[in-house]
Amino acid sequence: MTTRNDCLALDAQDSLAPLRQQFALPEGVIYLDGNSLGARPVAALARAQAVIAEEWGNGLIRSWNSAGWRDLSERLGNRLATLIGARDGEVVVTDTTSINLFKVLSAALRVQATRSPERRVIVTETSNFPTDLYIAEGLADMLQQGYTLRLVDSPEELPQAIDQDTAVVMLTHVNYKTGYMHDMQALTALSHECGALAIWDLAHSAGAVPVDLHQAGADYAIGCTYKYLNGGPGSQAFVWVSPQLCDLVPQPLSGWFGHSRQFAMEPRYEPSNGIARYLCGTQPITSLAMVECGLDVFAQTDMASLRRKSLALTDLFIELVEQRCAAHELTLVTPREHAKRGSHVSFEHPEGYAVIQALIDRGVIGDYREPRIMRFGFTPLYTTFTEVWDAVQILGEILDRKTWAQAQFQVRHSVT
């Protein structure tokens, strides 16, 4: 059985361990929720102060030029591109994941309407993140052209669900509940064989697992920066479009930042060439600047190293939970196979919500998703092996003593 000393030894050998010092982590907290909101980079505080006091305070409107505000979305996109297998000039950091999905799904359906107008099906998973389903449903309803969602209940059913009626396959690479990771390349190839376009949501992938959009042959990708990329609460999302598709159609939110001649102030819209056309309105500079602090840390390592540690952390967590908590009603819902696992681990428990609240009370922060799913995120930039060991011991104590049954842990908060 793995001991705490074994975990201390793993931490001593961890080449990524020094990066933890670049994050502001509270004393007495084991943070296993970076899959929901990443920790604050230490540099973010000074960067925010510089943007507010210097660039805004002293530079005023001049900072759109002198501080490079105008091109910040594109510059950040170029830096983020290296983490997802994209190239310079193919990614912009802007808006929210929901808004960017609306843009790319609209564009994909418009492309398909010119190629195969008879296709009216959007294939996705029942367990996809709800906002993705809501956006697709709302767009289909708005278009009033007979588009329908075909919801698939398990990954194994996807190959049969994608057929000649499919216009778009819209999937999240790593499932937000289970941590199941799709084979992006295989499913994209299958989509293309059937004449469909593939949209990938990388919310739980970017900064967590290696992604190569070009190698996978993907058509569109979106994702957020506030999880593993540590961009801060509500930080801007990103959007990528295959160069073969990018200029075929305009995206529907034709704001002035996406205009080819923004300050010509022309009465009619003319989209920029390339990914800049996926910009819309004026960018939130203070928040965007925080994204760069997170990307600065990633520039000091590589995704292969992060993936190795992620798998080691999640392997250890699964092993320890199944040893320490074997007598309790815990069911692993995350795949054991490395090729199918993201960077978070989920266990089901009948009192999952209350257990998570009791853990938080003890300084171990995970989160809860309906129904009965306890999620634990492992961020290789700052999670240690010893923290994994300590967290499992605390979980075991809570289950042994039924601490979760206390009334205070039954109270439902608005955010779980």
UniProtKB/Swiss-Prot annotation:
Name of this chain's protein: Kynureninase
Domain of life: Bacteria
Cofactor needs: pyridoxal 5'-phosphate
Organism from which the protein derives: Pseudomonas fluorescens
UniProt effect for mutating D132A: Reduces binding to pyridoxal phosphate and strongly reduces catalytic activity
Job of this protein: Catalyzes the cleavage of L-kynurenine (L-Kyn) and L-3-hydroxykynurenine (L-3OHKyn) into anthranilic acid (AA) and 3-hydroxyanthranilic acid (3-OHAA), respectively.
Subunit structure: Homodimer.
Gene from which the chain derives: kynU
Single GO biological process annotation from the record: NAD biosynthetic process
N6-(pyridoxal phosphate)lysine, modified sites: K227
Catalytic activity: L-kynurenine + H2O = anthranilate + L-alanine + H(+); 3-hydroxy-L-kynurenine + H2O = 3-hydroxyanthranilate + L-alanine + H(+)
GO-annotated molecular function: kynureninase activity; pyridoxal phosphate binding
EC number: 3.7.1.3
